[in-house]
Amino acid sequence: MHPNAFCDMPKAVERICRAIDNKENILIYGDFDADGVTSTSVLVKTFEYLGGVVDYYIPDRDAEGHGLNSKALVKLLSQKKPKLIITVDNGISSVEEVKFINSFGRDVIITDHHEAPDEVPPAYAIINPKAMNALDEKLTPLQIEYLTSLAGVGVAFKVAQAVLEKYNKLSYSYEILPFVTVGTIADLVPLIGENRYFVTKGLELIANGKHYGLKRLLDSAGVNIDNGLTSEQVAFTIAPRINASGRIESVDPAVKLLISDNKQEIDLSIMQLENLNKIRQQMVSQTFEEANTEWINSKSKDNAIVLANPNWHVGIIGIVASKFVENYYKPTFIMTYSEETKTYRCSARGVKELNIYDIITNISDKLDGYGGHQLAGGFTFTTEKASFEDIKKALNQTVDEMLNGKKLSPSLDVDMELSIDEVDTSLVENISKLEPFGMSNPSPTFVVNNLTLKQKKLMGSTKEHLKLTVETPNGTMDCVWWSRGDVPLLVGDKLDIAFAPQINVFNGVTSVQLVLKDVHADGLQEAEEVKQKVYDHRKKTNILTQVNDYIKGSEKITSVFAENRDIIESLKPYKYIFESIVNRVNAHKSDVLMFFDYPAEDDIMQSIMQKVAPDAIHYMNYNQKIHGEEGILKTFSGMIKYTCTTLNGEFNITRAASALGVTNDVIETLLEMFEDVQMIRITNRDENIFNLEFINSVELSKILHTSKYSEYTELMNTINEYKNKYMTMEVQV
């Protein structure tokens, strides 16, 4: 669609061209998310290409927030002396700020895509498809829908196209189209009309190496694009890394990645983005854990989740809110607070039944600023206007009124039920013809019923993802379930799965992998319904005799979990405690479960809880010696020798892991490490049984210098952190 579909476009182009020709200072005022960063880059690169004098400014998320900021403008007007300021992905609500700029005799062009208020800024030109009278009245309803679906970067691209056309250099639009692709995908706008073209063509350009920085960023993230690039790969690799810079620190590395022509500067930007993304992941994990504990301990029955903490970083509270919606399916409002300014800042995420922007608008009389759309929004308020409790009460009242007694329940639209043997590479190839996928064109969701879970592993730096292996008539198939590492599934469970299939290439081998969207398992349903009584004895001392007497006199079946050898040995004097000890292998149904020791990972904890299914849980604080890495190596060496001389080399992974109080991953790593130093040869690997052949004894010092040793110590650190968590975490009693 021609850019002149925007009524103010000719006026905007005339002013921009005048600024370029007269070498006036042009300032692009952007935003700190991926849409804002790519929008900024589109206009900066275009105006530089045309010979313009252009600079950019992106506000600090924490100090300045979204949109034009008066304090920032004072500095910019005095230091950069722009004659023309162009906003991208913001500005439509900045009435007073534009008046302020106008008072200095400077011109402002607003390019934005957010909902427009009744009063719009007195700008030189406004390019926003959602503003009143902004579009040509001759447009059809479908054309209007396409334009109002543009992301901020799509609107900026329209301006760039119009200016390039004026200079007869429209072919340059292909140089900036990759930016439009990234911003459009990241901002979750509907992939209809021109958005679909932007994404389809841009993915092709990026995959073909059109933009060095984006190609290098994909390489850094480990994304193989030999067979092309998908919208999902952009959404889960490029977009989070660009967003991380604006969330955590300065957004400059993200902008430089896109606009720089210096390969060294681009590579440095990628290193910075990767580091910021890791920090962002850690912050999200920690903040969600804190917020979730607070929510659980509150025992709230509210239909909205409203939480605040001055220590939560404003840059990641939106992601945390999204995780709450995924877990609880309730509209969620996560806030941080500044004591210095007496201001609360909130990021909100919604559910499809309730419009989050409408909820916020309903309490706007208590707010200093707000914005948003159907599923996401945000606001600020000072304690002079309202207290946190006032806002919490108002939000819940609004949600209750909108629900009118209805219960919120998540649902998943399924396209087709298949048998597992119908899920193959040809299915994925046929589905790929419908790409690119995104809003208004989701990837198809399929269902396969009655599968058997063969293997389960946790993935990710914080073990937040699940990798499952299910049995098929022709072998097995791998599945991944992002951000659901907490789901208590067990090997052997019968599963009904909803998924999207994709091609996975690993070590040159191509296979089908299922990206799970939901799972039904009978055992899972039973686990969710179990409500146990919890008792916290971790601050108590000298209670072993009392506990021993309790078990002796109780009619209830009691299990005592302990795998640590020192703990087991020290419990021997207490007959009834000692006789009640179980581990991950022999755990059985009991009325009461006592933890004198803690499992090595969440997967083991869930397995024990399902096997024992207790009515009551007792957490004990028992001084355990967490064995050092070298101590375990010596013990493990003895286990290997015993296996090879007495058990014909048949090594049981799970039993060994239980005996040492570690994970199966640790045992497998140890076996590979001992094979590397030629102490053993692994002659056969089954799911849980490795066959070993002893070669000769090896000095411990030789083992300590293997490449696998650092992997082993990292796994042990993770185990120790997990066990320590149970020693210190808050327990809901």
Question: For each of these PLM feature ranges, what is it?
Answer:
Residues 1-84, 103-105, 122, 140-141, ...:
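Hydrophobic helix-and-loop "lid/oligomerization" segment in the mid-to-C-terminal part
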Residues 25-27, 83-86, 559, 591-594:
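Structural motif
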Residues 42, 122-169, 173-185, 607, ...:
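Short alpha-helices
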Residues 48, 53, 196-291, 349-352, ...:
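Acidic, two-metal ion nucleic-acid-processing modules in DNA metabolism proteins
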Residues 82, 104-107, 612-617:
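A short helix->loop->beta-strand "cap" motif at the edges of active sites that frequently abuts
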Residues 88-150:
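Histidine/acidic-residue-rich, glycine-tolerant segments that coordinate divalent metal ions
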Residues 594-629:
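Long, low-complexity, charged/polar intrinsically disordered regions in eukaryotic proteins
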